[in-house]
Amino acid sequence: MISVNEMGSYVIEEMLDWSEDLKTEVTKLNSGATIIDCGVKAEGGYEAGMYLARLCLGDLADLKYSTFDLNGIKWPAIQVATDNPLIACMASQYAGWRISVGDYFGMGSGPARALGLKPKELYEEIGYEDDFEVAVLVMESDKLPDEKVVEYIAKHCGVEPENVMIAVAPTASIAGSVQISARVVETGIHKFESIGFDINCIKSGYGIAPIAPVVGNDVQCMGSTNDCVIYCGETNYTVRFEGELAELEDFVKKVPSTTSNDFGKPFYQTFKAANFDFFKVDAGMFAPARVTVNDLKSTKTISSGGLYPEILLESFGIRNV
């Protein structure tokens, strides 16, 4: 079986070799753990973001920069294509590990989750578990992890601290924006899973999403980065669905973000109105704007949702001068 941590370790080695070009900073802690700063104190940028996205996906997707038409503005975007959608997106990329140690907090994603089984139920559902001596993690945080954080991660992953490798970028950074937009395919799969769809029938995935500019602090950027997927994220999935076509159509109708009661305005406004309490925001909003599914069994293709660039432009706060 594919080891996402082994695949990720090769990407880390590339990042170490090209650190100066990527504008990242590498730190070796006393424990021997490797920390790669992609935007906390280091400058980082688009290429660092591309490497972060590769890490998150266990290097099991083809990633390319592209452009997206936002009402006449050619905007940077990222394309994602994978023939291993469950392992790449759910076993690796999904940000399913909230790491809180002392005053440190970050969202953990990437290969190391498959060692710690974060969360266990998901790995049982897709039938995947990794076994590798190195733990590779991507942290979305505005702080660099210290020895206590490394020790916590090593313990949960069953590896030695010296074999922990962490790449870090805050939400409010170009690298952070890139890796979040690269979650467009994963976001759709997660929404499918949340409405009771058997995600094991998904054979491949493709998606494209614009990349948010840095619009403010981490909370404000959390709004704009999510909006890239919510309002202009577009995904295509190839599935082999064993049920009736009408049942598949019903699932596809429920996936796009347009089905959410909170749809229609920049996410930061919704989040602020909810007193910045995620539990008061409709989870159904976290989905691509448009979803298309090609079913290999029926050979039919179904599409639902739409793109809303005007809301994304509002979220970005672009001023024409």
Swiss-Prot record:
The keyword Transcription does not apply. Its main location: cytoplasm. Its EC number is 3.5.4.27. GO terms for cellular component: cytoplasm. It comes from Methanosarcina acetivorans (strain ATCC 35395 / DSM 2834 / JCM 12185 / C2A). This is Methenyltetrahydromethanopterin cyclohydrolase. Keywords: Cytoplasm, Hydrolase, Methanogenesis, One-carbon metabolism. GO terms for biological process: methanogenesis, from carbon dioxide; one-carbon metabolic process. It is found in: Cytoplasm. The keyword Cytoplasm applies. Catalyzes the reversible interconversion of 5-formyl-H(4)MPT to methenyl-H(4)MPT(+). Pfam families: MCH. SUPFAM superfamilies: Methenyltetrahydromethanopterin cyclohydrolase. Belongs to the MCH family. Pathway: One-carbon metabolism; methanogenesis from CO(2); 5,10-methenyl-5,6,7,8-tetrahydromethanopterin from CO(2): step 3/3. GO terms for molecular function: methenyltetrahydromethanopterin cyclohydrolase activity. It catalyses: 5,10-methenyl-5,6,7,8-tetrahydromethanopterin + H2O = N(5)-formyl-5,6,7,8-tetrahydromethanopterin + H(+).
